[in-house]
Amino acid sequence: MNIFPILPGVDIAIHRQPEWQTSIKEAWSGVETTIAQRPWPRWRFSLQFEILRASVGEVAALAAFFNAQRGSFGTFLFQDPEYNSVSNQRFGMGDGNATLFQLNRAINTWLEPVWAVADTPVIMKDGVVLKQQMDYVVGTTGQVQFTAAPAAGSVLSWTGRYFIPVRFSDDKLDFERIFSGLWKTGKIEFVSKVYPT
């Protein structure tokens, strides 16, 4: 997957918004029943570029990236400037049988899956670094497959950087020429992909 280009002229204000989907049914008595439609929030992001320089190809790079995704059709990777790495993040506990575990991230006490790692993560069992390929492999959606089931009670953790798989919210992108060779964009919005667990 392609990585969203963060160019020098990006506005410092990047908005992020968790979005849930809840069905609410009300009985004739007024009693409500709520049903969560997904286990994880869908994240909405918005940003804009205050300055894009045509002379160094920034306008062309952003336009080409957007067109390569075919607007809201394609999935790409976004690295949130604040939430993009973990250190010694616990992602599971061995039970002696399971060999497949999903990497996760913590936002305070809230845990959610990491669907795309940015580089080779460091995987640890009880604080001891394991060897990739020999002890485990990491799949494209952040799942760790161990070659042997971690012993019951062993703590699994990881350190590394991650991306958020997203798609554009719209099929059009607005560029505005503000001066000769200088451009800016309107608000660019994208939404995270929610994968089955």
Model-derived features: where do they sit?
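A surface-exposed beta-strand-loop module
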Residues: 129-154
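Secondary-structure transition/turn motif
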Residues: 50, 104-108, 145-152, 194
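Extended beta-strand solenoid/passenger and fiber regions
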Residues: 60-134, 160-197
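Surface-exposed coil/turn segments at beta-strand junctions on protein surfaces, enriched
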Residues: 40, 96, 139, 149-151, ...
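A generic structural signal for beta-strand entry/edge sites
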Residues: 42-44, 98-100, 139-143
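Solvent-exposed edge beta-strands and adjacent loop segments
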Residues: 1-69, 164-185
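Exposed beta-strand and adjacent loop surfaces of beta-rich binding modules
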Residues: 44, 118-122, 153-155
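Beta-strand-rich interaction surfaces with strong enrichment in secreted/lumenal proteins
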Residues: 34-35, 89-90, 146-148
